[in-house]
Structure formats: structure tokens, C-alpha cells
Amino acid sequence: MSYEQMTRSDLIRLLEQHDQARSEAGKDGIVMSYTGRTAPWQIIRQVKPKMTKINQRVSTGAVHEQAENIVMEGENLSAMVTLYKYRGQVDLVLTDPPYNTGEDFRYNDKWDQDPNDPDLGDLVPKEDGSRHSKWLRFMTPRLWMMREMLKPGGVIAICIDHRELYRLGMLMDEIFREENRIGIINWQKAYSPKSDTGGKKGGLSTATEYVLVYAKDIDKAKTTLLDRTEEMDARYQSTVDGDPDEWKSGDCSGPNASTHRKMVYAIQSPFTGKLFYPPEGRCWANEKPTMKAWLEGWGSEYQDKWIDDDNQYTDKNGKLWKVKALVLKGTTFVNGEQVAGQKIIKDARTLALKKMKEGTWPPLFFGLTGETGPQQKRYLKDVKKGKVAMTYWANEDYTIPLNIESQSWDHEESGHSQTGINELNAVVGKGHDFKTVKPLRLMSKIIQIWCKPDGIVLDPFAGSGTTGHAVLDVNHKAGANRRFILIEQGNDVKGDLYAKTLTADRIRRVITGDWKAGKCSPLGGGFQFQELKRQQVDAAAVSALQREEMIDLLLTSHWDKSERSKTSLSRLLPGDSRYLFAVNSRNEGFFLIWDGADKPSILNRETFKNIIQEAKIHSLAERYHVYAALAPYSGRTVEFYKIPDRVLEHIGFNSRADAYNNDVDVDVEVEQG
């Protein structure tokens, strides 16, 4: 950009845009500044949806299963804009973008002015001095669009390593806001030192990578507990006392003694007569009546008693409180010390030892012999049905060899990235040219935590398809119904846009169980393979489509306001009917009166009679969804969609501004359908 050649008005406009971008991005906070920075919303507003084609040969599964998931081949920014029906509908964005390691992403400088330019640009080499600013310019509009795809309570989990960690973190703080940062996961990708020190003498071998996790709105986001492991549950047992419920010993004190002074007092052991107080700074975790009942479970009567142990405090009103101890009824104390040789203590010990031998001890006990301080039974049935995820995920989550029916292998190389490679090799075979693949367990764990069982997972940098594989695997194990959208451009250096030959192939193989390493249990499901075309969608382009092209567009763009992203049309085989081309989940038929731009497209009485007949043949509900250019006939059971108007509306076309995605609210009021 040459400022000398710009007019005064152009310079003023540029400064205004710059000030607006700084104001919106920073909101009085830190604002990133780099060469070629453009406000992401200014770029997004220029991106136009593209035509899509369904490749039935690559699609997998039954017709209704194909409608559940999407693998899309194409540039991801255009793809996300094209997937308008999913705007604001995604539960989790889980993705692994280019790490800027050198020649791992392409950038076209023309995208700054025209993001619709079809040229993908050149690979950015490691030696490029502007590689960081190019990476930021590449990522910024895509992250903005990922945020737009999320539900209000949606979450994004984005993988990165040390090369762009700091820049990505600042960018995420700008776009998602710092207050919406859930955490930064530090996962151990290797457990043995390697020669990789980042190209620097005296450097450190990189053993960890990171996942930055942000919510669209942290007040609406939900972090789910992970499933408990067998190892965790094995700590609970009932063989000690024969208790029918499994338990383990735990602390009977809690924090915040300063605000719970009445719960700081002595309790007397029924075995030894010794007095026990909570640890410094802590208080008993249970109410005093509960503690008294548990102590009396050992056979002796207890009482509240001031034992002159100086356990007192003054409240905020200046009132002095003497906190009484829980002691065996009838015992005598002098200055907080019990008088020795009391018969009450000997009798209490006899009763307590008898109870210990009989089994099923009270919840408060004094060790396995009665000689230690107080402990509390923690019952498995009372524990949360899961565990809270931490920000450090160590190697034990990823080192377990992947089982393939009767076959399994151990790691030939140290490092958890190799686990991902092994998993990919097992499914599709070697020779895929992928050197780094995320482990299946890593992605599965993230999905479990931040995507509900019937939610949608989006991966705009799908790569080898690990995210889709993980969704299917988690669904299969838990009986869930999560859906995925995978977007992959591929790399055409070798003439192979691997969205078909690798991404879709991996998903197909795990669905069917047809792994390269041998037959495995099929995970089930299906997906629709969509190809993003270069042709932009507008009224003229829609009106010029042939029938099969129009059907592809309708199948990929149609949504019902009452269901939005859950709207899925199952396509019927071509040639089955003259007008009927799909059905929805309510068994309602979708009919297309269209044979090309030069043929009549009219819903009249005669055509409607034929539509009713086709619906009866397929035993469909009496609700008819009809796409046509004109509709002189109408009826209470007819839902009419005008071509091209309603088609454009379903992909986010704003007719008032004659532009796409021009601040269109996804909940804009439209006619039902």
C-alpha cells in the first residue's frame, strides 16, 4: 500500500477505519498492531457464499446418516460463510490450525482487499520475515468467523505450539475477550528428550503443546465433568468393615475456619479419650449435631461441654463466645485437659472396640485400629459422577496402545504425537505424508468436556480427520449423538486435495470398520461430502442451475426456523419421483418444480395433484414443502419456497443491501420454513 498515491479522502477513510478497529478490538485494553491489519468484520462482510456440490460417491452411510455430518472440501473462510444455517448453532469449535513452522499455510496478499480472490497464494516459508504478520492476517478473520459459528454458550478449543502461542493468545483475547478465557491446557506430547531445541543452541527439548480454550460467553458456557476411571473407583472399598456401600477414608475438616469459628472445637476419641481439633486454619466440615451422632455411633453418649480450653472468640458486635467441645458424657476436664483414669473412658473404649469388630463403622472413625485422629468415610455413591479436568494433561492419557481387535502395538518412538501417527496409519495406512497428528484421546477428552451429547463440533482445519474420528468414537462408546462439520482445503502441491483421499477416507473407514490394519468394530454413522465450488451464489447463479445442482444447493442450505441446525433433509434416489427429492425428520416431503432456467417452474393445481400422489406413494405426512419460481396455487398444507428468493435467504442473503452477511442476525424473522 502506497500512502503517497492515496487521495486525501482515502487517507481520511483509512484513518477512520484504523481508529474504529482499535476502539472495537481493544475497548481501552491492549490492541495488537501488525503490518496489513484489517478489522476482521470488514473482511467477513466481503466474503460471499459459494456454490456447493454433493459428491455422492465419497459420501458414506445411509441417506439419513449422511444428513447428520458434513465433510467439506474447500477454503475454510468461504466454507464457514457458506454454512449459514449453522451460524450461531455450533457447540464446540475444535481445531488444529497451521503452527507457522514453515510452508504449512498459504497466504494471498490480495485477500486483504478481496477475500473472495480464488488464488490460494504461496506457501509462507520459515525464512519470510513477515511470516508472523501473514499468519495473523490469515487467522484473524477465520477466528472471527469461528466465533460467529458458536452458540452463545459455545466453546472454542484451538491447538498451538510455542511458535505462535503468544500471538494467538493475544488474538484470542481480542476476539473472544480475556474474561471469556476458560483456560490454557498444557498437554504432554512427548516424555523423552529429543534433539529438537527450537533451532537454538542451549535450547530446551519441546515436550508440550497447548490448547487455548475460550467461551463465546463464559457465563453461558458449561464445562462437563470427565468420566471417572476404574483406577479412581478402585480406591473405594468396603472390605475393612463390611459396609455394603464402597468407601474410602477422607479428611473430615474443611477450609475457612476464620468465618466458621463455631465449627472449630475439640472432639474426644471414644477409643483413647484424646482430644482432637481441626488442623490450623480449618474447621470441621460437618454440622455439630451430625458429628455428635457419628461419635455416638461408637456406643457411648456425648455432650456439648465447655472444657476451659480457651477456645473462644469475639464476634463483630463485641460479644464473647465460648465454643464448647464434643466429649464423652460425664468426663472431667481441668484447663482443657482430661482427668486421667476415668472409668467413663475405659467403658467407651470397650464399646468402641466391640463396634469395630462387629463391622459397618459410623461415618466418623479413628483409623483402622482406633488409635489415630478422626477420619471420615467418603462414599463412592456420594461422589460426583465424574472428575474435574485440570489444565495439565500428562502422558498417561495418551500412551495406552490403541487396540485393533486382537492386534495392538506399543510406541516405537517416544512421544505422544507418534500415538496420533500410529492411529492414522492403522486406519488409512502409511504414505499419507502427515508428520504430526493429534492423539485421538486428546480430542475425545475435549469433546467430552465441552460438547453436549447431541451437540455440533466444527473443525475448520480438519487435516487428517482426527476430530471427526473422535466424535464418532465418543458417540459409539457413550451412545451419544454428536454431529461434526469438517472443513479441509488440502494441499495441491502433489495434485492431491486430500479432503477426499485422507480426511473423508479416514472417516469412512472408522464408520465401516474397514481399517488398513484389519477389520475393526464399525463406529457407525455417516457423512455427506460437499465440494465448495468457486462460483459465488447470487440470484443469477441460483436461477441458472440445472435440477441436480439445485437439489444439491437446497439440501445443503435449507433450514427451518424452529430447528435451525437440526434441520436435515434426507435425499431420495434420483429418478424415484418427478418432484419429490427429500424428506425431513418429521416425514414431510420436499418437492422441487425445476428443470432449469428455461423451463416453467410453477406450482399450480395440476402439479399439486401430482405432488400429493407422490407423497402417498412414499407414505409421507400431509405437509408439502414446495420449491418453485411461481405459485398461483396455495393451500393450508403447502409451505412454498420461492426460487431464488428463499434460497438466497437461507444462505444469508440481505436483499436490502444486496450483500452477504451484512450484519444479518441469524434470528432475523423469516417466514416459517
Feature locations, PLM:
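PRPP-dependent phosphoribosyltransferase catalytic core
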Residues: 473, 477-673
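Class I S-adenosyl-L-methionine
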Residues: 3-456, 672-673
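Short His-Asn-centered micro-motif
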Residues: 72-74, 158-160, 395, 460, ...
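Short, glycine/charged-enriched secondary-structure capping and boundary segments
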Residues: 86-87, 107-110, 171-173, 471, ...
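Conserved S-adenosyl-L-methionine
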Residues: 34, 136, 163-167, 174, ...
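Generic beta-strand/beta-sheet core signal
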Residues: 93-98, 157-161, 215, 460-463, ...
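Residue-level recognition of the N-termini of beta-strands and the immediately preceding loop/turn
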Residues: 91, 153-156, 181-183, 455-458, ...
